Amino acid sequence: MELLNSLLLLFLIYLIHSFYIKNKRIHKNEAKGPIGFPLIGNMIQIGKTKPHIELMKLEKIYNQRILKIWLGDYYSVFLSDIDLIKDIFINKFENFSSRPKSPLTRLGTNDFRGINGSSGETWFKNKNIIVNAMKRANTKTIYTLLDNQVNDLIKEISKFESQNKSFNPKYYFRKFVLSTMFKYIFNEDVPYDENLENGKLSELTMEMENIFKTLKVGKLANSIEILETPYYYYLQKTDKVFKNIKKLIIEKYKNHNLSINPEKPRDLLDILINEYGTTDDDVLNITQVTLDMFMAGTDTTANTLEWIIIKLCNSPIHQEIAYNELKKVVSSKVIIDDSIKREITLSDRPNTPYIQAIIKETMRMHPVVVFGLPRYCENDIFIGDENYFIPKGCKVFINFHSIGYNEKYFKDPYKFEPNRFLENSNNSMDSFFPFGLGNRVCLGRQLANDQLYLVIANLILKYKLKTIDENKINEDGIFGLTVSPNKYKINLESR
């Protein structure tokens, strides 16, 4: 009984101490924020379902675009002010170049290897290797790959138009992105009619979905300091998800290593092997970099494609403007052979500004990674003209959703208006950086942009994208590691 009473007393003292730490002001210039509770901090106030929306409400309450938020035991700031963001991510990059560490990121990044979760010299070395590897990849081969993948996608969904059936494109966009990455990284073709549940991609698809579930935001044990070590060993003991997918990637690595020709790399994995080497540590880095590329380029691109389709279905006027632009470009091409299909390629992009504006406007209104990847403050520092104080150890997040709906940066932010990205008189482009900014900008942004452009342009050229019974599709998102649309279906009508 005495032991129990002692433990309860210790726990009470811990709760009081936790409450005190979370609510004392450490500097007169620190950001404002709501009352922090013991253990959980502000995780209840911002919620799990729509934290980006709740944070926008708090910005109005405190009348500032920087908020102090306790994520469990971790002091964090959420930013939606462009000047402050640029000051941190560009001007003071060295102090904010690292990623914060947690049990989940340690498990998911092979002890902070790779590109997404690494910091310091490890990140700098990996970044240079990946940039060089992507530069060495044959551009012509990549363009051909993308054209073929887009043709396969359109061929596969054309059955719904011919059968006059409604369908949800989620599965097909996800398969398109995974198939593209599979070919780009492993040089393996996936037949367009192959099923994701039992084909070549099945194991990878299943494990990727499990990883996104595992990493879903809001796991309390990942945010309580005294639980960090036991939680990590628990994860290590029970983990099957990361082990399975890393095992799959290592098998691909071994097969490549047996047949590699350093002078003639077949794919990105060959180039990574050439750049890194073949030591045990090199294998761990190659495995993690490969996993990072799949994670960064799968759900983000697939979900963005869905949001663009939804916006086009809900905005038929903008869809027709885009179609007329595409039709003009295609009709101006010299067709040598009637058998050659009239289609959009990446070379047409400079002549299709409205399509690009639609993509950007959708990404503004529906950023799929609303908070980006956090940064870590290495030392106490002041930021911005207001001299906000950011303490050492603070986690730093960008609220992309709040930026996109800020009238200071985007006039009539709740209106879908692609023209805002065609006008030189506004600051839309200066406020638009969906792939991040500074030295840690997303390395795969060009491939992602190419995929988005080719899929959307060729779909609009071939089909009218329509809602069912002319009812608008619900645009409320489901918050997770990425923000995805609710269930919906569309119709295709041949042009």
Curated annotation (Swiss-Prot):
GO terms for cellular component: membrane. It is a single-pass membrane protein. Its cofactor is heme. CDD domains: CYP1_2-like. Pfam families: p450. It is an enzyme of class 1 (oxidoreductase). Keywords: Heme, Iron, Membrane, Metal-binding, Monooxygenase, Oxidoreductase, Transmembrane, Transmembrane helix. GO terms for molecular function: heme binding; iron ion binding; monooxygenase activity; oxidoreductase activity, acting on paired donors, with incorporation or reduction of molecular oxygen. PROSITE patterns: CYTOCHROME_P450 (PS00086). Its EC number is 1.14.-.-. The chain crosses the membrane at residues 3-21. It is found in: Membrane. InterPro entries: Cyt_P450, Cyt_P450_CS, Cyt_P450_E_grp-I, Cyt_P450_sf. Heme binds at C442. Belongs to the cytochrome P450 family. This is Probable cytochrome P450 508C1. It comes from Dictyostelium discoideum.
